[in-house]
Regions:
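Short amphipathic alpha-helix with an adjacent loop that forms part of the alpha/beta core around
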Residues: 7-16, 109
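Histidine-centered divalent metal-coordination motifs
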Residues: 52, 101, 141
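Acyltransferase
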Residues: 144-177
Length: 177
């Protein structure tokens, strides 16, 4: 784990990560350290998951516009619907998520390279996916205990990145005496 202003893109790429999570933060994508450049460099080949600010950075990096949300959503729950694919594979068609943001990726001018994969009832984009790169973003916080199916969504990202955890046997291993 690294702060987005405490490591360079070159240093990240040297680490040869199998997946990258761009985490939340209190600023705009322009103020988010190396995030925009990292999306540009790593996005075509390394699976990326952007959460909140990371989602906004993905939208901006590919030509979308980050705008003020109609209302600040700090600690609010919203029901979303989604495509049922990629990050949302095998999840209920609609579920509640936790939101902590005042900025969003705007619907108008969403670049052709990005697909909105989840939204609220009033049409706010809650999920994005790049059409050809292994890049995904969610505006909400799947890591929040109040977000339904957050662990399953994160497990889906790990699977997409080829990092799905191995299943363990329920029985403990026997040791020779």
């Amino acid at each position: 784990m690294f702060r987005n202003d405490a490591i360079s893109v070159a240093e990240v790429m040297k680490l040869k990560p199998k997946g990258i999570v761009l985490s939340p933060g209190p600023c705009t994508p322009n103020e988010a350290g190396i995030c925009l450049e990292l999306i540009e460099k790593a996005g075509p080949k390394i699976p990326l998951l952007g959460v909140c600010l990371g989602h906004q950075a993905i939208g901006q990096a590919y030509g979308g516009e980050v705008i003020r949300a109609p209302a600040p959503m700090h600690g609010k729950l919203s029901k979303i619907t989604h495509t049922g694919k990629s990050l949302f594979k095998s999840l209920p068609k609609s579920f509640e998520v936790t939101r902590y943001h005042s900025l969003i990726v705007g619907r108008k001018g969403l670049p052709d390279s990005l697909i909105a994969t989840a939204k609220t009832a009033d049409g706010i984009i809650m999920g994005l996916q790049h059409k050809t790169h292994p890049v995904h973003g969610v505006q909400f916080h799947p890591e929040s205990i109040a977000s339904e199916h957050g662990h399953a969504l994160l497990a889906n990202f790990l699977e997409l990145a080829g990092l799905a955890p191995r299943r363990r046997n329920a029985k403990p291993a026997r040791h020779a005496a």
